[in-house]
């Protein structure tokens, strides 16, 4: 690879690091081109999957200020640059790794911090953003309904008490004075 080509490749990788919300690092040794194409299809919309030389990735990462990942760049390395929800991309990679034992998750980088394999898998086990928001909305709806019931309770209790007193007075004989 010519020096100019390397500089272009480093610039492209650095740009992908800058644009990504997270980067998931994998080893793809033993996967076929068809397997890699299948993995890329499963990541559609949430991430792009790129294979690059380790030295170029290290250089690009240091250019954008990403530290602590050098030990992950050994062997055939590919990176999923996540532009959407990290949960979706992590789920897709974890699912693919279960089906294809040749794909090994090495770690990742998110919010300025390196991630271990366990952290990437924990993110993959989370529910999607939409599901979590729906659960939050449901919990809030229940809480609001309880609060409204509590606020309305004194008023409704007073109304029932007044109605009971009126009924009681209606059935009592008028007192003679």
Curated annotation (Swiss-Prot):
Segments crossing the lipid bilayer: none
The protein's name in its UniProt record: Large ribosomal subunit protein uL10
GO cellular component, one term: large ribosomal subunit
InterPro entries, per the entry: Ribosomal_uL10, Ribosomal_uL10-like_sf, Ribosomal_uL10_bac, Ribosomal_uL10_bac_type, Ribosomal_uL10_CS_bac
Gene: rplJ
Record keyword Iron present: no
SUPFAM superfamilies: Ribosomal protein L10-like
Organism: Mycobacterium leprae (strain TN)
Listed GO biological process terms: translation
HAMAP family for the chain: Ribosomal_uL10
Pfam families reported for this sequence: Ribosomal_L10 (PF00466)
Family: Belongs to the universal ribosomal protein uL10 family.
Subunit: Part of the ribosomal stalk of the 50S ribosomal subunit. The N-terminus interacts with L11 and the large rRNA to form the base of the stalk. The C-terminus forms an elongated spine to which L12 dimers bind in a sequential fashion forming a multimeric L10(L12)X complex.
GO molecular function, one term: large ribosomal subunit rRNA binding
Keyword list, A-Z: Ribonucleoprotein, Ribosomal protein, RNA-binding, rRNA-binding
């Amino acid at each position: 690879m010519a020096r100019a080509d390397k500089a272009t490749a480093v610039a492209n990788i650095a740009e992908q690091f800058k644009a990504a919300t997270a980067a998931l690092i994998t080893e793809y040794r033993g996967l076929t081109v068809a397997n890699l194409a299948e993995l890329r299809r499963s990541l559609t919309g949430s991430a792009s999957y790129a294979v690059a030389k380790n030295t170029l990735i290290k250089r690009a990462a240091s250019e954008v200020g990403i530290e602590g990942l050098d030990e992950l760049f050994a062997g055939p390395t590919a990176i999923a640059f996540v532009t959407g929800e990290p949960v979706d991309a992590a789920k897709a990679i974890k699912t693919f790794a279960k089906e294809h034992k040749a794909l090994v998750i090495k770690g990742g980088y998110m919010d300025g911090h390196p991630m271990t394999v366990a952290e990437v898998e924990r993110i993959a086990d989370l529910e999607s953003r939409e599901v979590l928001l729906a659960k939050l909305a449901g919990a809030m709806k229940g809480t609001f309904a309880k609060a409204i019931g509590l606020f309305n309770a004194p008023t409704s209790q007073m109304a029932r008490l007044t109605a009971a007193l009126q009924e009681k007075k209606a059935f009592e004989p008028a007192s003679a004075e």
